[in-house]
Amino acid sequence: MLEDTTIHNAISDKALSSYFRSSGNLLEEESAVLGQAVTNLMLSGDNVNNKNIILSLIHSLETTSDILKADVIRKTLEIVLRYTADDM
């Protein structure tokens, strides 16, 4: 996975990036999930915007069979949705 600074700089929604950056260890697992989603988007050449992050997280949620991991993905998705404008 890419370095945290690179991941946060790639996120187009700076308020979302700042929220995760300032959370410290409170959202450690969620930050890792977000980081993986952003890394996947960057490696595939997609724009790192909220819409694509949401789609990536939904895909991860649909494909995991691990209940605990699904819960972390769901929490991450909820946070991203809070920072997403209604007019997507």
From Swiss-Prot:
The keyword DNA-binding applies. The keyword Cell membrane does not apply. It comes from the Bacteria. Keywords: DNA-binding. One of its GO terms (molecular function) is DNA binding. Disulfide bonds: none annotated. GO terms for biological process: cellular response to acidic pH. Pfam families: YmgB. InterPro entries: AriR. Belongs to the AriR family. Homodimer. Regulates expression of genes involved in acid-resistance and biofilm formation. May be a non-specific DNA-binding protein that binds genes and/or intergenic regions via a geometric recognition. This is Regulatory protein AriR. It comes from Escherichia coli O1:K1 / APEC. The gene is ariR.
